[in-house]
């Protein structure tokens, strides 16, 4: 998401039930504003795991503020019903901040971070750990994000460079 904007902007936040019940404000949550640029050594990974093990997962995500880039202002993101998880976070951040046009179909609405365990017969139970909320207050779990420009498609017409959503995205970029 940091590549979409030159500025440091709040992206969204996760909030656990415990933090929500306490009435904590998003502004008071710990901030994650930079991802490591180098792969840490195994000892650093172990140290980080021990530091954050059992910690409340509530955190604010903030873009890194990487400065101006050539592509800023001319970005189109293509979505469909399989766009989920971090893909929905990127789309929501871009849409809320006017950083890109979203073209295609509504996203999946599957965004809650969770952890799971096996229950046998090849099944897993996944339990939510926290809710994800965009900085503007929107939650997508169970209902996806509508694109700026809805483009109908079918599996037969979606393959290849002339798929309707890609054609629409190209038109937007060329105009």
Show which residues each predicted segment covers.
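C-terminal "post-core" interaction segments
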Residues: 1-175
């Amino acid at each position: 998401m940091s590549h979409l904007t030159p500025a440091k902007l709040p992206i969204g936040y996760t909030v656990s039930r415990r933090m929500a019940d306490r009435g904590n404000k998003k502004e008071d949550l710990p901030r994650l504003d930079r991802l490591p640029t180098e792969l840490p050594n195994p000892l650093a990974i172990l140290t980080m795991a021990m530091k954050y093990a059992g910690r409340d997962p509530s955190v604010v995500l903030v873009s890194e503020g990487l400065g101006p880039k050539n592509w800023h202002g001319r970005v189109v993101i293509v979505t469909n019903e399989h766009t989920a998880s971090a893909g929905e976070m990127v789309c929501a951040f871009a849409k809320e901040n006017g950083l890109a046009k979203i073209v295609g179909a509504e996203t999946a609405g599957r965004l809650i971070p969770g952890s799971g365990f096996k229950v046998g017969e090849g099944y897993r139970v996944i339990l939510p750990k926290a809710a994800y909320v965009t900085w503007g207050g929107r939650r997508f779990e169970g209902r996806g994000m509508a694109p700026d420009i809805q483009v109908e498609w079918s599996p037969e017409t979606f393959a290849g460079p002339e798929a309707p959503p890609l054609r629409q995205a190209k038109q937007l970029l060329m105009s």
